[in-house]
Amino acid sequence: MMTMTPRDLMRAQYVTRWQIVPTTRSQSVAQHSWAVAMLAMNLWCRRTGGQPGEAATDVELGKIAVMALWHDAPEVFTGDINTPTKIFLNASNALDELENTAGDGYLESMDGGPIRTCVKIADFLEAMYWLMEHGDGHYANNQLHGLNERFHQYLNEHAPLWRDSAVALWKELSDVNAETTTFQRVNYLKANDA
């Protein structure tokens, strides 16, 4: 079995996503995978009530991070694979054959169960967020709408126990009036730097 080399993995930072969807900026597979990992860990804590720093939670968060970082690794060989192409390739088992060449690390990280469900939901959330923030034009809006429909269909059919946590996270992400805490933290640090 072939395995991915470190040089193969480093190519993820150069493989761009959204080839057929107009966006206002580019995104690499590496950026996408990192964002999916962050969202999946947040979603896991929301769903389970766990907190980072708790031993059991940290073990699960580690597994989630690994799966999220690996989930699109085969795209270092193929480039970004858009959804219509994935549907076509899945029908012919070509994606399974490609994934089998990625090596044991990739295959082990893709085991099923609740962690895979969590990462799949985070993958949807990250893509919807990216299109909401950076999608450009009518076609991008149509893609966002279709992605949102597939997201809710996935929750209803495959992840009903995750629905409330996933929808709440999407509402938070899609709130255009929401603020980050960056400047609050800077001001706090300034005020307490004595």
Swiss-Prot record:
Co(2+) 2 binds at residues 75, 80. DATP binds at residue 17. Transmembrane segments: none annotated. Pfam families: YfbR-like. It catalyses: dATP + H2O = 2'-deoxyadenosine + triphosphate + H(+); dADP + H2O = 2'-deoxyadenosine + diphosphate; dAMP + H2O = 2'-deoxyadenosine + phosphate. The keyword Cell wall biogenesis/degradation does not apply. Its cofactor is Co(2+). Uses a typical 2 metal-ion mechanism to dephosphorylate dATP. Keywords: ATP-binding, Cobalt, Hydrolase, Metal-binding, Nucleotide-binding. One of its GO terms (molecular function) is ATP binding. Signal peptide: none annotated. Catalyzes the hydrolysis of dATP, dADP and dAMP into dA. This step is essential for Z-genome synthesis (containing aminoadenine instead of adenine). Specifically removes dATP and its precursor dADP from the nucleotide pool of the host, preventing the incorporation of A into the phage genome and favoring the integration of the Z-base into the viral genome. Belongs to the Caudovirales dATP triphosphohydrolase family. This is dATP triphosphohydrolase. The gene is datZ.
